């Protein structure tokens, strides 16, 4: 079963996968979690947008690298509403998901380290993630996904 669908300039338009949401202007592509995640009566979907790390200096530090941000949308009619964004992979900040460093083919598009739970989702980091932690939990609070411990930054 296909869980993450490529979208963007080469992968096709966003409307076919997440109607009502367009990529950020600087995004070079995206992966859409095709699953709908429920928290209470609300439904959510994750969109992973890919950006160049150092677009203004492609020969410099991380010039060929990428930054990936997870955008979480509340699937509210008539248009999805963004409820959070988290940096999940970064050449510049040396942050990455555990699943993207598993050494398997296509692991760069493996977002299985984002695990949805009853009140939000947990991210398992490769090595030490933001703030030196190995995992971070984000919960839905007052309409936004926020870290559940103050030591975990919402990057």
Where do the PLM segments sit?
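Exposed acidic/polar residues on beta-strands and adjacent loops within beta-sheet cores, strongest
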Residues: 1-155
